[in-house]
Amino acid sequence: MTLREKYGEWGIILGATEGVGKAFCERLAKEGMNVVMVGRREEKLKELGEELKNTYEIDYKVVKADFSLPDATDKIFAATENLDMGFMAYVACLHSFGKIQDTPWEKHEAMINVNVVTFMKCFYHYMKIFAAQDRGAVINVSSMTGISSSPWNGQYGAGKAFILKMTEAVACETEKTNVDVEVITLGTTLTPSLLSNLPGGPQGEAVMKTAQTPEEVVDEAFEKLGKELSVISGERNKASVHDWKANHTEDDYIRYMGSFYQE
């Protein structure tokens, strides 16, 4: 059974332009679902939409939206109002490196909107639809920083922790329904952003050896959908979390994560 047959005609990817979001779009289209692609780079999304339409004979919509704005969801919800919605993935994120007091409040507010407020509005909106029709699926994307916290990148980790715990709770609430909900927690992933900032030498080589591709992440997410509520992506990441929780204190884990960003 394809995703379209199981969940409905349309899926929405929030943060669809590249990386994991793009891989979600490709997976939906491959399984016959029409795709609503939401992001800031409208032309790039249209190019992706045409590529998917020509390859998989699906339909698409592009919604240009800035997730950091308080009214970001207005045009998103309007664009999907009359569609047979069956899937949602929230991939969008925003972070800023530095100590809390050294980051301008405007940046903090933007991160709260992207990582918490807009996420929650979208999750609430589409869950109401899926629950009412007793059909649909949600996969939200968290990060290892949401498990450990992320010193010098604190708001990002806190936002990902909110996505992680909120989605886990809703996933449990929907277990005995026909709505499948899952959160997938990512480690290092080979997105265009990572590749453009990859350090040279042994450090960069080490990252390349452990990182997953967006396609690997999305494949695992769908493999576990309807079977597990909360997934840590990749065997290395699963083993790492297990080791730290079994053999180290929470303080050790926090300081370890902080060592990656400490100024």
Swiss-Prot record:
pH-dependence annotation: Optimum pH is 6 and 10 for the reduction and oxidation reactions, respectively.
- The entry's active site is 156
Signal peptide stretch: none
Residues the entry annotates as binding NADP(+): 17-21, 40-41, 66-67, 240
Q: Which InterPro entries match?
A: NAD(P)-bd_dom_sf, SDR_fam, VLCFA-Steroid_DH
The entry's function note states: 7beta-hydroxysteroid dehydrogenase that catalyzes the reduction of the 7-oxo group of 7-oxo-lithocholate (7-oxo-LCA), to yield ursodeoxycholate (UDCA). As R.gnavus is a common core bacterium of the human gut microbiota, this enzyme contributes to the formation of UDCA in the human colon. UDCA is regarded as a chemopreventive beneficial secondary bile acid due to its low hydrophobicity; it protects hepatocytes and bile duct epithelial cells against necrosis and apoptosis induced by more hydrophobic secondary bile acids like deoxycholate (DCA).
Task: Quote the protein name from its UniProt record.
Answer: 7beta-hydroxysteroid dehydrogenase
The species this protein belongs to is: Mediterraneibacter gnavus
The organism's taxonomy opens as:
Bacteria, Bacillati, Bacillota, Clostridia, Lachnospirales
